[in-house]
Amino acid sequence: MSFSPSFDALVQALTCLSGVGKKTAQRMALDLLLKKNAEAATLAKALTTALATVQRCRYCRNLSDAEVCLLCADPLRNRQQICVVETPADVIAIEQATDYRGLFFVLMGHIAPLDGMGPEALGMDILDDRLANEAISELVLATNATLEGETTAYFLAELAAKHGIQATRLAYGVPLGSELSYIDKQTLHHAFQSRDHYHEL
């Protein structure tokens, strides 16, 4: 039963968000309309502004308000390193959790031939040009630990080798606080393959 077509339209629009089903969308819509009218207006304005302003950086393809993003424009970044990730969310995660201070390149996906996602769709031509014309010494492969991510990492490693650039892959390991008996076989296998000299945390 529908009591407001506008409310229904808002609920339907909210379900486009990742992980948001109809029930959650209904709660969000009610919260916005009944409790937080001013905040809802601020949200609507911020979304409208972001849709009109945010674009992809011409160098790294990350989200940016300008032609060149803040990370690429930062003179303090290590310009000899490029970390290749699948999404802007990966950039945020690395920036928040590590001391990496090189540059990034965002693929906006991974190689998936069945979905029509080949190297060209991921901006590999832009990356190839950068590797050819910039003084890059290391390409950090930070794609996901999935079949598609590994396929993409392999392609990237070949691209780096073509330009005589070192390619490094993020190590896989056992998460802190976990028990070995609960770790999947692939993670445990990679953890053994990537083992290093012991040092205190």
From Swiss-Prot:
SMART domains: TOPRIM
Superkingdom, natural source: Bacteria
Keywords: DNA damage, DNA recombination, DNA repair, Metal-binding, Zinc, Zinc-finger
A molecular-function term among this protein's GO annotations: zinc ion binding
Swiss-Prot/TrEMBL GO biological process terms: DNA recombination; DNA repair
Boundaries of every Toprim domain copy: 80-175
Family per record: Belongs to the RecR family.
HAMAP family to which the protein is assigned, alphabetical: RecR (MF_00017)
Summary of the function given for this chain in its UniProt record: May play a role in DNA repair. It seems to be involved in an RecBC-independent recombinational process of DNA repair. It may act with RecF and RecO.
Protein name: Recombination protein RecR
Organism name: Dichelobacter nodosus (strain VCS1703A)
